[in-house]
From Swiss-Prot:
CDD domains: Radical_SAM. Residues 93-312 form the Radical SAM core domain. It comes from Xanthomonas oryzae pv. oryzae (strain KACC10331 / KXO85). Its EC number is 2.8.1.8. The keyword 4Fe-4S applies. Belongs to the radical SAM superfamily. Lipoyl synthase family. It is found in: Cytoplasm. This is Lipoyl synthase. NCBIfam families: lipA, PRK05481.1, PRK12928.1. The gene is lipA. PANTHER family: LIPOYL SYNTHASE, LIPOYL SYNTHASE, MITOCHONDRIAL.
Length: 337
């Protein structure tokens, strides 16, 4: 059996700098240390764990990656693949697939695991839905994933912009299946407004990531709430029983097997159909450190556990990400044609 790679020292969390940070400027990105410096928690320097043999990324040759990047820039589009430093970017781009990130590239949250920039976002780009639809049609995509930064500055959390993008894609590419990976729409009345708006043009798959176990939320997802995310998933499913719901969990942040299993049970109890489970990789030294590399055998055990709970599809493996091979995941759950 593969031996786990883990820290021999406990994670130490220190409170953020008490000095008031400089005011945010609209559209200016706070990344890496600048972003985490504004977070409620920061992390004491610790030795970096050596990546085990099963954490490897193939970088394919050819011009496909650069060609796709050029097309995205031409249409002023952003992918979460680039902004979040996804390890699978070269594989996905080389196959002509991408997860589009709408509503800008500046997030109002400061999650300690995420490499997307923090700051004060610009207003939504009214031309973005049309540009996205053109790109999807040009690429001939049969399955597309659309996600966004958190937009706590918007009354609907960006739900109307999601609907505008869905409608535009369906107009130009009626046979394309659409998965949306949404923020939590947290805030007074925001979830209600968002769900009412999404009902106007719902996706083929509704995805919202739970990310981690509840005990780790204060350090991993400051500004988010575990039960709120579960409720969002359940309420969408209640409104749209025939639409698949999906969520994702990262491993390696300090959780235990028992905690992960409990989270899987919570997701099923809240009517989530599909689940992705993958290894967290630290994007910069300023972010939450990797506490442990889970083994392939453990991912297999979680896949079997999830199947036993009744998920329609479980994708569990070190390099699995929420939208990695999303078309295959959906096909396995009976969504994509």
């Amino acid at each position: 059996m593969t031996q786990p790679t883990a820290r021999s020292i406990p994670l130490q969390v220190v409170s953020g700098d008490t000095a008031a940070p400089a005011p945010l400027q609209t559209g200016v990105k706070q990344i890496g240390g600048d972003k985490i410096h504004r977070s409620p928690v920061q992390f004491v320097d610790a030795p970096v764990l050596r990546k085990p043999s099963w954490i490897r990324v193939r970088i394919p040759s050819g011009n496909a990656v650069q060609n796709l990047k050029a097309k995205l820039r031409e249409n002023r589009l952003v992918t979460v693949c680039e902004e979040a430093s996804c390890p699978n970017i070269h594989e996905c781009f080389s196959h002509g697939t991408a997860t589009f990130m709408i509503l800008g590239e500046v997030c109002t949250r400061r999650c300690s695991f995420c490499d997307v920039a923090h700051g004060r976002p610009k207003p939504p780009d009214a031309n973005e839905p049309a540009s996205l639809a053109i790109t999807v049609a040009d690429m001939g995509l049969k399955y597309v994933v659309v996600t966004s930064v958190d937009r706590d500055d918007l009354r609907d959390g960006g739900a109307q912009h999601f609907v505008d993008c869905i409608s535009a894609i369906r107009t130009s590419s009626p046979n394309t299946r659409i998965e949306i990976l949404t923020p939590d729409f947290r805030g007074k009345g925001r979830m209600d407004r968002a769900l009412d708006i999404l009902a106007l043009s719902p996706p083929d798959v509704f995805n919202h990531n739970i990310e981690t176990v509840p005990d780790l939320y204060p350090n991993v997802r400051p500004g988010a709430d575990y039960q709120w995310s579960l409720t969002l998933l359940q309420r969408f499913k209640a409104q749209h029983p025939s639409i698949a719901t999906k969520s994702g969990i990262m491993l390696g942040l300090g959780e235990t097997m028992e905690q992960v299993q409990a989270t899987l049970r919570d997701l099923r109890a809240h009517d989530v159909d599909m689940i992705t489970i993958g290894q967290y990789l630290q994007p910069t030294p300023h972010h939450h450190p990797v506490m442990r590399y889970w083994t392939p055998e453990e991912y297999k055990a979680l896949e079997e556990y999830g199947n036993a709970l009744g998920f329609s599809h479980v994708a569990s493996g070190p390099m699995v990400r929420s939208s990695y091979h999303a078309d295959r995941q959906a096909a396995g759950a009976g969504v994509a044609a």
